[in-house]
C-alpha cells in the first residue's frame, strides 16, 4: 500500500509493495533479487527512493527513528551521501514508558526483545559519511526538540506504538513535497503497535 497526498508518501512495509515497485521500475532494481536472501527489499526500495529524490533535487534532511546498531542507517547514509542524517535512538534499548504503554494498551502481552547491545560510537563507526550524521540520543520525541529542518526521507523503525505515532506526528508535517516516510513492521505481528499508529494517523488525516 502506498498513500500519496500532495507528493508525500507513507509506505506500508510489505513484500507485495517491493515486488510491485521492482517490476514497475526494473531499471533501478533487480527484480530477481528483490525479496530474496540476496537482496533486502527495504534496501531495494530505499535505493529507488533515493534515486528519485536525488534526480528531482528534492531538498531536506534524512532521518531514522530506531537505529539500533545502524544497519539500515548505514544504507541511508550511503544512498544520501550529501544529506544531513539525523539518528534518533536511546542506544540503550526500548524505553520503559513505551513498552509499558503497549502492554497496558493490550498491544503486547510481554516485554519485547532487548535492543540494548549498541552505542553511538558503534553506529557512527559503520557510517560511510559520519560527518553528515547528527546523533540524538534519548527518548523520542524529546530528542526532536529544537529541530527546524524539513525532511525528504524518514525511516521509522521504532517498533512500538508511542514512538511510531510520535514520529509520524513530528515528521509528516515537516516532510517536503515529494518526500518519503518508510515505516517498518507494519505487518509484523510481534509489533502490532506500529500498524495501530499508522492506521490512526491515516484515519485522522484522511489518508485513505
Task: Please annotate each region the language model reported.
Residues 1-208:
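A short alpha-helical cap/connector motif
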Amino acid at each position: 500500500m502506498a498513500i500519496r497526498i500532495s507528493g508525500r508518501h507513507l509506505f506500508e512495509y510489505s513484500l507485495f509493495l517491493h515486488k510491485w515497485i521492482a517490476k514497475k521500475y526494473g531499471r533501478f532494481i533487480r527484480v530477481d533479487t528483490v525479496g530474496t536472501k540476496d537482496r533486502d527489499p527495504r534496501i531495494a526500495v530505499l535505493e529507488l527512493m533515493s534515486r528519485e529524490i536525488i534526480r528531482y533535487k528534492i531538498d531536506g534532511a534524512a532521518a531514522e527513528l530506531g537505529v539500533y546498531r545502524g544497519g539500515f542507517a548505514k544504507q541511508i547514509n550511503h544512498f544520501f551521501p550529501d544529506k544531513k542524517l539525523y539518528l534518533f535512538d536511546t542506544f540503550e534499548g526500548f524505553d520503559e514508558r513505551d513498552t509499558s504503554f503497549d502492554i497496558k494498551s493490550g498491544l503486547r502481552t510481554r516485554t519485547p526483545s532487548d535492543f540494548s547491545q549498541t552505542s553511538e560510537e558503534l553506529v557512527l563507526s559503520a557510517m560511510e559519511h559520519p560527518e553528515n550524521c547528527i546523533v540524538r540520543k534519548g527518548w523520542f520525541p524529546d530528542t526532536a526538540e529544537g529541530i527546524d529542518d524539513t525532511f525528504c526521507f524518514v525511516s521509522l523503525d521504532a517498533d512500538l506504538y508511542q514512538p511510531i505515532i510520535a514520529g509520524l506526528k513530528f515528521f509528516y508535517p515537516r516532510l517536503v513535497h515529494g518526500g518519503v516516510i518508510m515505516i517498518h513492521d507494519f505487518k509484523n505481528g510481534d509489533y502490532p503497535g506500529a500498524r495501530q499508529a499508522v492506521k490512526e494517523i491515516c484515519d485522522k488525516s484522511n489518508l485513505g
